[in-house]
Design a protein with these regions (language model features):
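N-terminal Lys/Arg-rich, disordered targeting/topogenic segments
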Residues: 1-31
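N-terminal type II signal-anchor transmembrane helix
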Residues: 21-60
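Membrane-helix interfacial "entry" motifs
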Residues: 28-31, 209, 213
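A structural signal for short, hydrophobic/glycine-enriched beta-strand patches
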Residues: 56-210
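A transmembrane-helix-recognition feature enriched in membrane-embedded lipid enzymes
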Residues: 211-238
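Extracytoplasmic/luminal low-complexity segments enriched in Pro/Gly and acidic/polar residues
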Residues: 238-253
């Protein structure tokens, strides 16, 4: 009778206690080997989808119909050469380079010590005529540089009364999706933004996880995209840009 009552007690989901409730014994469900096999298969599938899908997700190429090419000035020379080929192979009329102060100089000094200026000179060196190239420097560095560069481009269009309905932006592979997101935020819904990803020739993008540089690039750009997508505040960035500009003006002799 007592054994039957104990079984009934446990079947009802009650715990057994000893030592005045200090020790408790409970029955619980646990995964069987079949259950663990299913969990392992699910984890493996998720991991495979991540490895095979994250790179093409970040390094997206999607051109729009446009006669304006934008080149992020900080990109490496292999990407600059790809931008020159893109310009010469299509019906572009102008190419704009963007970017803030060159890394390592401690902040904005003048427009000619910016990534926009460096990128413009590299485009000319690789064969583009001066008449096609226009640098659009930004004074923003450190935080939200891509958005600051896009805002500087938007302001240049407005100041020069240049109506723009679409652009294509050349940048480096894993930065592309974030570039499109931030340029869209800066330029607004009336401007279609296309992007062109230039692959890093130093590693095989289809097996990026085999290379330390590939792992670093994927995780850093993935985290940066999540920040831009869910945490970035354009109004805060605009206030920071105004502060940088004001400080640069005040520092002039």
């Amino acid at each position: 009778m007592a054994s039957a009552q104990a079984l009934k007690f446990r079947a009802a989901g009650h715990a057994r206690q000893k030592l005045w409730g200090i020790l408790v014994r409970k029955e619980r469900w646990a995964l069987s080997w079949r259950g663990w096999l299913i969990v392992l298969a699910g984890v493996s599938l998720t991991f495979y989808v991540f490895l095979s899908g994250i790179y093409p997700f970040l390094a997206v190429t999607h051109r729009v119909n446009s006669n304006i090419l934008v080149v992020e000035g900080w990109i490496h020379e292999y990407a600059i050469r790809a931008a020159v080929e893109e310009f010469q192979s299509n019906s572009y009329e102008r190419v704009f380079t963007t970017g803030g102060p060159v890394v390592g100089i401690g902040g904005y000094i003048n427009d000619y010590q910016t990534s926009a200026s460096v990128g413009a000179e590299l485009l000319k060196k690789d064969g583009l005529a001066n008449e096609f190239v226009q640098m659009v420097p930004s004074r923003v560095m450190d935080r939200d540089r891509t958005y600051g560069s896009a805002v500087a481009l938007r302001n240049w269009f407005r100041e020069h009364n240049m109506p723009v309905h679409s652009i294509n932006v050349v940048t480096e592979d894993l930065h592309t999706r974030r570039t499109r997101l931030l340029f869209k935020k800066a330029l607004g819904h009336d401007v279609a933004v296309g992007v062109i990803a230039v692959a890093n020739p130093d590693y095989d993008s289809t097996h990026w996880w085999r290379y330390s540089e590939g792992v670093k690039d994927v995780f850093s750009e993935g985290a940066a995209y999540l920040y831009a997508k869910f945490l970035f505040n354009p109004s805060m960035s605009s206030r920071d840009e105004k502060t940088v500009v004001r400080n640069a003006v005040n520092s002039k002799p």
